[in-house]
Each structure stands twice: as structure tokens, then as C-alpha cells.
């Protein structure tokens, strides 16, 4: 199944660029998709030349062109490898605020997914820094952030879902987007596909220790059981559309979603988490949501963040 027609790979020099390129190339090949490779020089056109002139006293324009030529040459090497692999590829060196220019590229060209290696750390792994988090929060299409040096293929993929009540169609669509994407990735990598839903009884601790309710533990136990049963029913209803997920691979996790999903991913050596993010649908601007933020800042595996329908990026093509 072709899930993507246009893949954008961000190959910043300070990121896990090789990992991102290999994954983007593999994804483009599997989908017969076009591949665009970009790097961003963190200065607006003309600013780099002025800065270099101030530093060197002369020849700032020529030196700036050398800098841009270096970045173009670096992308051209990646591009040549993609062409040798039979992939339709183009390259672009952008100038400006990095996350803004990448998102503007998505808006202009209609890319289906952005792939980026996280900022490289001395130990060879990736860490999520400002550029990475801005793209994850504000890019309108799914963003795949790779954090490990060996992220070329995956053995275990986790779809983190939040099954909706029957009357919440928007949340149901987001969950299905997450599962469709995770299932496609698992099929291509021949990876195990797991699905997790975190649940809890709101204010359970306060109820168990409250002045008026601490003596009613059996009643609180029944409330917890009912909440668990509701969560189980919603998860089963969602997974009825995904027979490829074995019952043993669906997991109800009790606790704060951000914490228990991150803990589960570490304990089970999950390679990739696919998750939805919570936004203010229809508003220009985006709130990632506590669950997604906690997961992103806690996990040591790669993540694909999927936006809800109706999401509007605060970045505009002109001046945003």
C-alpha cells in the first residue's frame, strides 16, 4: 500500500543525518515516492554575507557563497546515492529560521511526511533540541524523528492510542491515522506491532486518602474496575478494524499516559512509537499536549508524531 508520495528529509549537519537519509531512502523506495533533501542555513538571504563581511573586513559575499556551496555539495552527495538507488530526488538549501523554512517547504510542496534525525550528541545518539521540538509541534504533516544511530530498521513498533467514546469522531479518526501509519511501518519492516492505551481513574489517590472517602476502598475499587472495563471496551472496538494486531500485542497500561507509555517503551525495547498529538483544532497555533510532550522528552527511541485533522500551523508562507 502506498502511504506516501512525497518524502521530505531534513539533513542538518548537526543531526543524525545519515540515519535520516537511510530511512527516508528506504521509505521512498517502498512507496515509489519522490524524495526531497533539504538543509537550512540559519540566516536570511543577505544576512550571512553581511555577518561575514563584518568578521573578515571584506569578501563577505564570496565567503557566504562558499558556505552555501558547501551545503549544496553535501546534499548533492546524498542525492547521488538516492539516484543510484533509483529514487526520484531533488535537493534544496534553504535560508532562514530552520524550522520555519522546513514547514514553509511542506506548505509549498505538500510533502506527506518529514523525516529528521535528532540533534547529534557526543555518544552518537540523538537528543531533541529546539529545531526538533519546533517541527514536532508545528509541522502540519507527520514528523518522524530518529534518535538512535541504528534506526535504519525496526523490530518492535508501538502505536500509542487514546480510544474515543462513540460520539468523538475526531479522536477516532486520529487514532486510525496512528494505527494505519504504524501498521504500514510494521508491515514494511516485518516488525512486531503493539498497541497501547493508558487509562486511570481521575483523582484515585485523592479518593483513597480523602477525608470523606478513605473508608470506602471497596467502592473505589469498583470505580477503578469500571474505568478499566470502559478503557478495554474502547480499545477492543478500535482494534476490531485491525485484525493484524494479535490480542497479546494490545496493552492496557494503568497510570499517567505520558509516563506509563514511555516506561513501557523502554522496558519492552520498542524501536518506534507512533502517536497522535492533541491540538486546538481550527486555531492557528498548536499545543502538543502533556502526554506527547512527556513521551518525547522521556523516550530513547524514535517517534512519529501525527497531527489531528483540522490542525493549522502558526507558520505562514509569508512572514509567519
Located regions from the model:
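Structural beta-alpha unit
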Residues: 1-3, 16, 23, 45, ...
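Active-site phosphate/pyrophosphate- and oxyanion-stabilizing loops and adjacent acidic/basic residues
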Residues: 133, 180-183, 236, 293
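Gly/Ser-rich helix-loop-strand patches that form or flank binding pockets
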Residues: 3-5, 21, 30, 99-153, ...
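Charged, low-complexity C-terminal accessory regions
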Residues: 138, 198, 220-275, 280-281, ...
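General small-molecule cofactor/ligand-binding pocket signal
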Residues: 36-38, 90-94, 144, 194-196, ...
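A short acidic, glycine-rich active-site loop
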Residues: 57-73, 217-230
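Hydrophobic alpha-helical membrane-association signature
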Residues: 20, 71-74, 174, 178, ...
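Small/aliphatic-rich secondary-structure junction motif
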Residues: 1-58, 156-217, 313
Amino acid at each position: 500500500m502506498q502511504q506516501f508520495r512525497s518524502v521530505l528529509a531534513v539533513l542538518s549537519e548537526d543531526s543524525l543525518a545519515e540515519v535520516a537519509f537511510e530511512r527516508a531512502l528506504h521509505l521512498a523506495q517502498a512507496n515509489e515516492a519522490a524524495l526531497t533533501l533539504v538543509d537550512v542555513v540559519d540566516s536570511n538571504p543577505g544576512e550571512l554575507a553581511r555577518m561575514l563581511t563584518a568578521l573578515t573586513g571584506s569578501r563577505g559575499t564570496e565567503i557566504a557563497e562558499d558556505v552555501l556551496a558547501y551545503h549544496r555539495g553535501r546534499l548533492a552527495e546524498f542525492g547521488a546515492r538516492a539516484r543510484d538507488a533509483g529514487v526520484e530526488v531533488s535537493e534544496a538549501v534553504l535560508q532562514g529560521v530552520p524550522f520555519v523554512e522546513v514547514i514553509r517547504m511542506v506548505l509549498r510542496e505538500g510533502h506527506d511526511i518529514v523525516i529528521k534525525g535528532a540533534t547529534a550528541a557526543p555518544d552518537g545518539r540523538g537528543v531533541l533540541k529546539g529545531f526538533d521540538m519546533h517541527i514536532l509541534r508545528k509541522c502540519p504533516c507527520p514528523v518522524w524523528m530518529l534518535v538512535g544511530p541504528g534506526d535504519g530498521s525496526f523490530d518492535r513498533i508501538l502505536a500509542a492510542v487514546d480510544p474515543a467514546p462513540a460520539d468523538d469522531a475526531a479522536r477516532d479518526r486520529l487514532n486510525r491515522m496512528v494505527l494505519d501509519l504504524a501498521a504500514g511501518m510494521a508491515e514494511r519492516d516485518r516488525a512486531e506491532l503493539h498497541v497501547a492505551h493508558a487509562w486511570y481513574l481521575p483523582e484515585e489517590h485523592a479518593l483513597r486518602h480523602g477525608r470523606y472517602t478513605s473508608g470506602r476502598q471497596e467502592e473505589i475499587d469498583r470505580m477503578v474496575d469500571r474505568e478499566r472495563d470502559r478503557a478495554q471496551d474502547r480499545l477492543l472496538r478500535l482494534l476490531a478494524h485491525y485484525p493484524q494486531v494479535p490480542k497479546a500485542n494490545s496493552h492496557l497500561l494503568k497510570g499517567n499516559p505520558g509516563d506509563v507509555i514511555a516506561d513501557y517503551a523502554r522496558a519492552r525495547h520498542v524501536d518506534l512509537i507512533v502517536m497522535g498529538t492533541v491540538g486546538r483544532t481550527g486555531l492557528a497555533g498548536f499545543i502538543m499536549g502533556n502526554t506527547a510532550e512527556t513521551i518525547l522528552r522521556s523516550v530513547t527511541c524514535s517517534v512519529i508524531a501525527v497531527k489531528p485533522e483540522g490542525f493549522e500551523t502558526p507558520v505562514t508562507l509569508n512572514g509567519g
